[in-house]
């Protein structure tokens, strides 16, 4: 197993490891704008409606693919797998959905909030944008998240039909994405 590229985002910085990029940013909307079209090749459908973890996941994957020199294009499919994890699952999205449900008299909540109540939704949004057709898996671990998710991704590389897997650990404080081959 080899790490071909790494993209990362903290609360005010982003970067790529192999290309030795490290820059500041103000917010995710401005980061999204400044990465187009060099790193984010074409607009991400519904990006402004994404929850925070979906934005972090998608942008970090773009950074990691750029770092790994893997190109993607609109409509182009690639057999690349996607494994994701984080420390809270979809807790923030579930809380936002429930608050919206309460605010609407316990009868309705907005559907655009519901989709992100599943912890695999950020991965699915990214897979759609980048045309990834390999296996998609969300993992939840109580301890050793980095080590256990890396072990799982490596095991998948050994037995799956894909030669490349993207591993994302998405958290609001720090998101790191690695392209494994």
Where are these regions (language model features)?
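Conserved "HGTGT" condensation-loop signature of ketosynthase/thiolase-family condensing enzymes
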Residues: 1-181
């Amino acid at each position: 197993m080899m790490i071909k590229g790494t993209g990362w985002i903290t609360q005010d910085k982003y970067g790529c490891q192999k290309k030795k990029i490290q820059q500041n940013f103000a917010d995710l909307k401005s980061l999204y704008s400044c990465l187009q079209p060099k790193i984010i090749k074409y607009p991400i459908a519904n990006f402004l409606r994404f929850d925070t973890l979906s934005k972090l996941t998608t942008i970090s994957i773009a950074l990691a693919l750029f770092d790994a020199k893997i190109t993607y294009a609109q409509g182009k499919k690639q057999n690349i797998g996607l494994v994701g994890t984080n420390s809270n699952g979809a807790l923030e999205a579930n809380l936002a959905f429930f608050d919206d449900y309460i605010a609407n008299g316990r009868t309705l909540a907005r559907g655009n909030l519901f989709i992100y109540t599943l912890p695999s939704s950020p991965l699915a949004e990214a897979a759609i944008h980048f045309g990834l057709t390999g296996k998609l898996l969300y993992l939840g671990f109580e301890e050793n998240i980095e080590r256990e998710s890396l072990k799982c991704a490596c095991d998948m590389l050994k037995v799956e039909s894909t030669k490349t897997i993207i591993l994302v650990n998405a958290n609001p404080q720090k998101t790191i994405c690695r392209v494994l081959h």
